[in-house]
Every structure is written in structure tokens, then in C-alpha cells.
């Protein structure tokens, strides 16, 4: 089975993030890695749950980008100067910023273009981030950690929310996504049409209270494109948090 791992976004907490991916995936499977990362001297982490205030500034190591290449040994990669998409600080009621949204989805589009240009049609494609913690957040018996190759490539797999999460009907966890080429092509190509979806498409803007939430945006995108989805049970039944899966290392 040909497997590709896509990493994109801001490479915060990349050292521990690499250890996690190495432990659970890179050491266990034959995986081709593709990287896209934004280049900057520092990355800002905002807290959506505290009125969008700045929570932490991550200083960039001088050897960060060299380390990414040396450690992951990617099939292909692109490091690109950070782009300011929005100077007006547009954000929704839940404090997610349009600028951050566009950076996230454009980075994913960039790394998808790398894999597409390779000409290799992978059986399974795994999209993730640089800063995720799986250990003690996801059970060893979870299908993702037990045997990645058993996931059906016809479906888009993602961590399911806890049963008591009130927005399950129209949101999905966006930390990871796994599927075959066809479903992942749709997932990774949200960026070219996201502004039209947010600001023009009435089927989106008229149906959701906050149009600037990534979890709502990607769920709507997949539903609109008739992509079959299959939530992954983390194995802890929600007792480790509503996201029911890996956590972002702050």
C-alpha cells in the first residue's frame, strides 16, 4: 500500500510533533512525506475561547526548516514566506480569524499540489499538523493507531466529537484527515473556493451563525461535494475532551 503523509501550516512545537509522528506512523509504515510550512521569525497563537486574545508567541529556531528536511526526509517540500491575507482582522463571533483560516487552507492546498505533481497515486493519504499529541490522547486500540492500513480509502476519516458536543450535525474535527486519493483531493482543495463559500454562497452564509469556523467550513465543503465521511472513535469515549482525539501542543 502506498501511503503519503501531508504536513502543512505553521511548524509550532515541531520537535515534539515529529517524535509523535515518528513513534506512531513513520517507524511503522513505508510512508512518503510531503511538507509545506510558512516561514516567519515568530508565530502567534490566539485563544478562540478567550475573546481571540494572543495566547502565546512561538519563536522560530534558526535551524527549524533544516530540521524539518533532515528529520522527515520529504519526497518534496515547499517553505514559503508567511502571507498576510487580511489587514482588517476580520473574525467571527467565535473569534476565528479569516487571515488564519486562509493561511491554513492555502498551506494545505500547497502541499496537495506537491503530491499531485509527483504523479504518484497513493492508496492512502494522511493530512496532519506539525504540533499534534497522540500519546495518552488516543487509545492504542483506536483504528488510526492500531493499523492505519485498515481504514477504507473510499471514506474521509477524521476524529469524531463526543456525543455531547452540540455542533456535531454541521462540524467536524479538522486536525487530521485520512482517505484515498479522490476524497482527499476534495478535502485539500477547499482554499480556491473558500471566499466564495463564506461571502457569496447563500447555502453556507444563510445557514450558519458563524461562517468563520474551520470545522463548519470543511464539513460544508465535503457535504456539498458528496464526500462520504466516517468519524474515528479515539477509544476514550469523550473522557479526554470534546474533540475526542489528539490534542494540539500549546
Stretches with model-predicted labels:
Residues 121-133:
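Short beta-strand-to-loop acidic/aromatic patch adjacent to the donor-nucleotide binding site
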Residues 148-171:
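A short, conserved acidic/glycine-rich loop-to-beta-strand motif
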Residues 97-114, 119, 133-139, 165-250:
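Catalytic core and acceptor-binding pocket of nucleotide-sugar-dependent glycosyltransferases
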Residues 1-19:
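N-proximal low-complexity "stem/linker" segments adjacent to membrane-targeting elements
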